[in-house]
Amino acid sequence: MYGLFDERVAQVRAQLAAVLKAPADGGREVYERDLAAARLAGEIRRYEAAESGMVFGRTDAADGTALHIGRLGLHAEELELPLLVDWRAEAARPFYEATAVDPMGLRRRRHLRLEGRTVGAVNDEILDGSEATADDVVGDSPLTEVLQARRTGRMGTAVATLQAEQHAIVRSPHRGVTVVQGGPGTGKTVVALHRAAYALYAFPRAAERGVLVLGPNARFLDYVSQVLPSLGENDVVLATCEELAGVVPTVTEPAESARIKGSSELADALAEVVRQRQAVRGEFAVQGVRLGEREVGRARDAAVGTGLGHNRARQVFKEYLVDLVTDALERDALETLERIDAEVAEATGLDLDRAAAADLRKLGFEEAAGSSAADEFDAEAVREGLLEDPQVERAVEELWPTLTAEAVVRALFASGVSQLGPWSDADVPLLDEAASLVDGPPARTYGHVVVDEAQELTAMQWRMVVRRCPARSMTLVGDFAQAGPATTARDWGEALTPHVGARFELHTLTVSYRTTVEILATTRDLLTRIAPGQKPSSAIRRGEVPRTLTVTPDGSTAALLAELQDQHAQHPGELLGVICADTRTEELHAAGVTRWAHLIPASQARGLEFDGVVVLDPEGIEAARVSGERDLYVGLTRATKRLCTIAVRQRSSEST
């Protein structure tokens, strides 16, 4: 199998070398050569990414047919069956979905773990009820091994251990909007990223136009950044809303004004700001020609009717006015020439046109049919001159000024609703909305969009997403129990209906693979408060009972450092996280907390996971933001093994 793999890689490398050496004469040939080189280089990257753990499974059918399952497909022309089946292919479906109740024609599902190119471990599941034979290796579930493994600070693929409810969503044929609701640890992010890889494989539009993965923050995107490349997919863009808009916010918006700026009413308000700068009233006067409000209104309607962004529509407006002025100048020129002819004829008794024609005939020239004084007016030259005339440009600018997105947003808040200082995170979708009004749709759109932590998006951020996915092919994953302070929607229907109507499929993940029974039990009352109608996830693992320390305010930092040092000594090599109110991160960083653990502000903890988590001052986290209870819920569910909370109260230290 690896022999064929090496052969294919060598072939692609040779093709790339030949393309790069090929001469290219002219821009078109250079473009085509570069395009071919980029395609081949991407193919090489896909092969390289798939080499590690290339094969991870095998299915043995009851009729004896065996298929190996891996990160990519390999086919030899002389063989009827593929050497390796891509995990996204239909033939791989039984590997993920077969059960003892419905074995889907399989006798055995085999999990393989490679060390380099050598099989390091084998585990078999007998699915048809038959007895295990000497060829079967039955042990702990590969999922159990993965769940018990230490965290690394980066998410890995779950391509070998996707569970049936997850896999069904990943492979859903629905090309519209797929929504995945699930509590902490249910694998929402895993589903989202593997869904992106599947979309590239199965949906031609996604493969042609690419996939966008939108995450809540840069920390989260760094955490998941290696998943898709390790699945062999490089045609995926990972971004935050800020990166999509090309804006770097430098201040944090207060919660209440963030909710206002996130509301859909702001879209109409921004559109009105632009509309008021599109020749709502006024006349246009250049070169002695005056166009009244009626003519200007016709020009405005023609420009607006194109559906172009304000600045491109401005050129249509300008050209329409210039055409009207050119027509007026031509009429004036004709009237002037006719008046001169009439005055000369009256004074001399001569018809100048007839006299000129007679003279031309005497000289041997033929009279041009239909010639007149109007033929001497070069309308196209006049039109071009007007388009380049600074006076015309100034007159157009007064009626239909060139705009920037920044100017539109600042004009919206000129009444004092918001400070006009540096941009905040809540300003980003407003700037993007304004950019679409001013310059038209974004330059880059995608065939499929995946949004993680989608419950975080405001109405204005949803508009950002939809603009970049004209086909409305999206996978959205989240949990409204973890929603932040700017979110006003209470459920998926409320969030999505304005953009896609009822055209979305809702799936619910019910099993928590990351969080233990004991940890989920500590969050049950909190979940009831923040999401009364939401059913708790069911954990499949048991672990340590969470501990609580109670300390005085003056002793909280020292207690935290002592706890981290103790955990570090008892569990060397494991990944520790400290989650605290955002306002305390600077102080704790200065105290040296990052020597022992990752320091995470509560507002940034969504989507992350650690072996052990220490939540510092739960009451402080609750009080820090409007969504404080939800932030605390997120923080308490980040651990895969151990949870410790340090409560800060006036009483002396206790431990439970």
Say what each PLM segment does.
Residues 154, 158, 188-192, 317, ...:
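Phosphate/oxyanion-binding active-site loops and adjacent basic polyanion-contact surfaces
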Residues 1-168, 653-656:
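Extended, charged low-complexity regulatory segments
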Residues 46-51, 58-61, 102-104, 111-113, ...:
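A general structural signal for short secondary-structure junctions and capping/turn motifs
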Residues 1, 5-8, 12, 16-27, ...:
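P-loop NTPase Walker
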Residues 66, 75, 200-449, 456-464, ...:
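Alpha-helical nucleic-acid-binding subdomain
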Residues 154, 313, 515:
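Conserved acidic
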Residues 206-209, 218-261, 433-448, 455-656:
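Conserved helicase motor core of SF1/SF2 NTP-dependent helicases
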Residues 163, 167, 171-174, 197, ...:
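Amphipathic, well-packed alpha-helical segments that form the structural scaffold of globular domains
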